C-alpha cells in the first residue's frame, strides 16, 4: 500500500506538519509540567525550612554566656518570603498556562500566543529577581559581612541554610525552564 499524503500549495506535507506541531506541543506541556513541579518544590522547601538551636550569647565579658534557644525560619527574612511568593505565583500561572495549552489543541490565535509569551517572560523576570534577592541573603548568612559586623549564621543553622540554598537553586532552574518556554513561544509566532 502506498502512503497517501495531502500537500499544500507550497509542497509541504500536511501530515508532517501535524506531527511536528504535536511533538512541539508535547515538549511544551512537558516543560510546563517541569516548571510547575520545580516552582512548587522550591516554594515548599523554603516554606517549611525551620531550625531551632541553642546559641550562647555573651552580654558582659566578665559573665558566662547565656544560652538562648533561637529559631531560623524563612518568614523572618523578607527576601525568603518574596522567593516563596514568587514561586507560588509562578506555580499558579503554570497550572493555568498548562490548561490553556491543552484546551487550545494547537488552534491558538496570535493574541493568545502573545499573552502566553508575555506571561512566561514575566515569570522569568519574577523568578530571576526572587533568586537574586534570596541568594544575596543566603550568601550573607553563609559568609557574613565583616564591614557591618554581621556574623555567619550558617555554622549554627546549617540545615536551614542548606534548605534555603536548595530552594534558590531550584528556583534558578525553574527560571531557565521559563526562559526556554519564552524561546519556544517566540518560535511559534507567525
Swiss-Prot record:
Localization terms from the record? Cell membrane
| Sequence ranges on the Extracellular membrane side | 50-83, 133-163
Q: Which residues lie on this side of the membrane: Cytoplasmic?
A: 1-28, 105-111, 185-190
Keyword vocabulary terms for this entry: Cell membrane, Membrane, Transmembrane, Transmembrane helix
Check the record and name the Pfam families matching this protein: CASP_dom
User: Which cellular component terms (GO) are annotated to the entry?
Assistant: plasma membrane
Q: Which family does it belong to?
A: Belongs to the Casparian strip membrane proteins (CASP) family.
Put simply, this protein is called CASP-like protein 1E1
Q: Which organism is it from?
A: Arabidopsis lyrata subsp. lyrata (Lyre-leaved rock-cress)
